[in-house]
């Protein structure tokens, strides 16, 4: 590490502890303080590498409160390493306010590259990677999430999302509805771990696979969706909803859903939710 005081943005393993780079390990051992998203989680990594550098918690709930103390630490000539629980800091993790404040204070901000779940999944997905957009976590609420996907359905770039295990089933069903059940996609989970899975299929198939999966849904998922063809018009989901609405006007819900699923390829459970919300009185 140079003698220049700096805020180091250090990427840490997303599962396999061997993925910490020698440079990252050295910097974590040499800085005066480590700002960690969760000190309990990061302690396991530091203990594994025999690193005894003091830590302080920096997460979304205390980042603004911690800024004065951390900036003062840097002004005193003591470098800080920022780490998240796993992967590259600031990629759907805290740290933005600290990095911005360091720049404004004239303090060097130095990236120490390494693991990132989004990029690892993209590299193994087999989807176009010359243009892509990282969209982070979709909204938790169904209506907002559907709108979130709908607004991105015509984007020609490969889209990368993170999702939690308790929302992955609903999110994939909503993606299939808004992007179209036949849109190419990839689900990646447990990356670099023993039960690593990278599965490529149509969105409708992935939604059904996850819903039927017998293995526990643990850890965060990365979902990658192929971009819409440049010539694409309105999202396929809009056609599916129109077809469903026409059928609901003439048929019972169960029959309308069955026919709409056969016509559009959208999963029945997704169409059934729409039917309950939209069936005319």
Where are the language model's segments positioned?
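General beta-strand structural signal in soluble alpha/beta enzymes
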Residues: 36, 111-114, 161, 187
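Short active-site oxyanion
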Residues: 27-34, 106-110, 158-159
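A glycine-rich beta-strand to alpha-helix segment
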Residues: 75-120, 166-170
